[in-house]
């Protein structure tokens, strides 16, 4: 599954590699990889594969789940597809509370006392996922863990999830993506070294 998802992400250019002309993330980090999993929404076959893979992952890793929770905004559609497939209630979590109305940070199914799994599109440093986890915990949820489409495999993310004692699982990952890109001739051996060093040194 990890290899198939990595290939799909590369084929539809949801993930692009540029070892010699770095991208700039919104955080200011210079990176040889850019991931925009919102692109998957335009490809029903890829979208369904992600839905089915994450649904199976939730069942296998967490068993009995009460609510599927998406991170705003990119995790919301995938959470909706999964909750429909698993016939579960859904909610989503904003990065911060609204400044008007009821000032809700969480919209949808009530989380208090419920077993919740968070759906994210991408794990980079883990910051947005952990914001969602903490908001759900503050609302009284029992957060079982986080699932996502892809991870860069950054040590910072591992450290942050370990710190809050919440596991995360992804359908594919940076190492798998690099291997698929190598097999398809999209990157050279020198590029691979650049990509690995970037990840290990970040």
From Swiss-Prot:
GO terms of molecular function: magnesium ion binding; orotate phosphoribosyltransferase activity
Q: Which domain of life is it from?
A: Bacteria
Q: What are the alphabetically sorted keywords of the record?
A: Glycosyltransferase, Magnesium, Pyrimidine biosynthesis, Transferase
Role: Catalyzes the transfer of a ribosyl phosphate group from 5-phosphoribose 1-diphosphate to orotate, leading to the formation of orotidine monophosphate (OMP).
- UniProt cross-references to HAMAP family, sorted A to Z: PyrE (MF_01208)
Q: How does it assemble?
A: Homodimer.
Family that this chain belongs to: Belongs to the purine/pyrimidine phosphoribosyltransferase family. PyrE subfamily.
* Protein name per UniProt: Orotate phosphoribosyltransferase
Give the organism, scientific name.
Answer: Staphylococcus haemolyticus (strain JCSC1435)
Underlying gene: pyrE
């Amino acid at each position: 599954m990890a290899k198939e998802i990595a290939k799909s992400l590369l084929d539809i250019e949801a993930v692009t590699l540029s070892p010699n002309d770095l991208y700039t993330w919104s955080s200011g980090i210079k990176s040889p990889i850019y991931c925009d999993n919102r692109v998957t929404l335009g490809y029903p076959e890829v979208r369904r594969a992600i839905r089915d893979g994450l649904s199976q992952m939730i069942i296998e890793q967490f068993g009995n789940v009460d609510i599927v929770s998406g991170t705003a905004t990119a995790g919301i559609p995938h959470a909706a597809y999964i909750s429909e497939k698993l016939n579960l209630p859904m909610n989503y979590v904003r990065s911060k509370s609204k400044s008007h109305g009821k000032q809700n940070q969480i919209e949808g199914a009530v989380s208090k006392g419920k077993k919740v799994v968070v759906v994210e599109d991408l794990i980079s440093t883990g910051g947005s996922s952990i914001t969602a986890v903490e908001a759900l915990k503050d609302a009284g949820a029992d957060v079982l863990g986080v699932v996502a489409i892809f991870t860069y495999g950054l040590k910072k993310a591992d450290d942050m999830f370990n710190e809050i004692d919440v596991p995360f699982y992804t359908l594919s990952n940076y190492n798998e993506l690099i291997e698929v890109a190598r097999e398809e001739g999209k990157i050279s051996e020198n590029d691979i070294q650049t990509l690995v060093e970037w990840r290990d040194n970040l």
